[in-house]
Amino acid sequence: MKRLFSLLLLLAPLSTALAQQFVEDSLKVDGYVRRFGLFLPDGIKADAPLVFYLHGYGGRIQRDNPMIETASREGFAVCIPQGLKDPKGKPSWNVGYPFQEGWKVDDVKSLSKMAAYVQKHYHLSRENTFLTGMSNGGEMCYLMAYSKQKTFKAVAPIAGLTMVWMYRDLEACKPIPLFEIHGTEDRTSEWTGDLDNKGGWGAYMPVPLAVGYWVAKNRCMKEETERVEGLNKDNGHYIIQHRFTNSATGCDVWLYEVVGGKHSTHTEDIKTGDEIWSFFKKHMGK
């Protein structure tokens, strides 16, 4: 299937119908078959940027995730991996939840290997590869940022959290651009954190403190704050956009505080895919 698709991609100018594709592929890492979907928009060019989108806890390969529409307009590829089943039988990313203890799946390694595979076999950019994800996928973004990986140039967790164990046991080896989007009324991934593990997901940090770690790590010396009304005028939500910048390193940190927002991708409040792509594009290599 993959080889056939590659041939069709080369013949794309002959047929628009063949140019825009959603294909499924897989590779084996540490004995596990790792599946993924890949969206390649109409007219995509060789060495185009690549964005990974990670589903939430219990999720599946999501063809209608917030990045697809943006990718169709902007010409980048979107890879949507499938998490493996954890000890509770739920597809997920191994971020060290208490009930994942003893689970040997290394998703930092698996996603890095997958990115290298996709870059090579689908002729996509090695330099401009980025990572975003929702909830459990957002936690995976933070874990990747803390890890000694060189694959993902920037990360954008949505409703993501920094587990206390990450902050305690890991030391980020280098600055990395980070963009968090989070609702203040999120009762699944609490804005105020859960240091006592009352929710059963493990202890995790308050969102402003978790983001503040990266502000300090990236040595962002300037903050710009702007209040923006949400797209849905009926729900009363508004967004406080915190942008922390470092002109020397270029490793910015953004936090979109969705006031009144709950546990979601916030597509009713902002153009989530466009905002994330705007952040990633700002950090692309030439």
State the predicted function of each range.
Residues A17-L50, G59, T70-R73, F99, ...:
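A domain-start/cap signature at the N-terminus of enzymes
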Residues K109-E127:
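Conserved acidic catalytic loop of the alpha/beta-hydrolase fold
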Residues I44-G89, F152, V164-W165, T188-E190, ...:
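Short substrate-entry loop that stabilizes the transition state in hydrolases
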Residues L4-L14:
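Sec-dependent N-terminal signal peptides
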Residues E180-H182:
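Short beta-strand/loop motif that positions the catalytic acidic residue
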